[in-house]
Regions:
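Short amphipathic alpha-helix that is part of the acyltransferase structural core
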Residues: 1-28
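A conserved beta-strand-loop-helix scaffold within acyl/acetyltransferase catalytic domains
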Residues: 31-36, 47-58
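Cytosolic beta-strand hydrophobic patch enriched in CBS
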Residues: 41-45
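Conserved acetyl-CoA binding element of GNAT-fold acetyltransferases
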Residues: 55-69
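Conserved acetyl-CoA-binding loop-helix of GNAT-fold acetyltransferases
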Residues: 72-87, 107, 111
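Conserved beta-strand-loop-alpha-helix junction that forms the acyl-donor binding cleft
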Residues: 95-110, 124-126
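Conserved catalytic-core motifs of GNAT/GCN5-like acyltransferases
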Residues: 97, 115-132
Length: 140
């Protein structure tokens, strides 16, 4: 189930996420270079927090598992892709970065490269991808 969050809910989850910074499981989720003030945020199945934040006129999508005790279901993955498609129609382009050592996120990048028109860049540590909605892909 996808739930769009209000500002109070976002603030509560951000506090929880901040507490993960010392947890080794989450070591690949943080990059302290930018403040995160989401334009929109969602929760999928009480497990995945997804936010869409604008940096320099580009929408970045962030995804974090906030409840590693809950098992991932195929429905969660379907909901994530559904949300991505909906927000791509809204924002027209979405970027995402990850540490390549974060195998789950890096696999998601590879999937996006196969499914969508995108540009990508990789260095030794990070992968960055930008997905662009083309005119031919827009549905009325």
């Amino acid at each position: 189930m996808i739930k769009q969050l209000n500002q109070n809910e976002i603030d509560e989850i951000r506090k929880k996420i901040d507490s993960f910074k010392t947890d080794d499981y989450y070591k690949y989720y943080f990059d302290e270079t930018e403040e995160n003030n989401p334009d929109k945020a969602f929760l999928i199945d009480d497990k995945y927090y997804i936010d869409f934040t604008i940096y320099n006129d580009i929408c970045f999508m962030g995804v974090i598992d906030i409840s590693k005790e809950i098992k991932t279901t195929s429905n969660s993955v379907y909901e994530l892709l559904k949300l991505f498609d909906e927000q791509l129609k809204y924002y027209q382009k979405i970027a995402q970065w990850c540490y390549k050592a974060n195998k789950i996120a890096y696999r998601f990048h590879k999937f996006l490269k196969k499914k969508y028109n995108c540009v990508s860049f990789e260095d030794k540590e990070k992968s960055m991808i930008g997905v662009i909605l083309l005119w031919k892909d827009m549905k009325a």
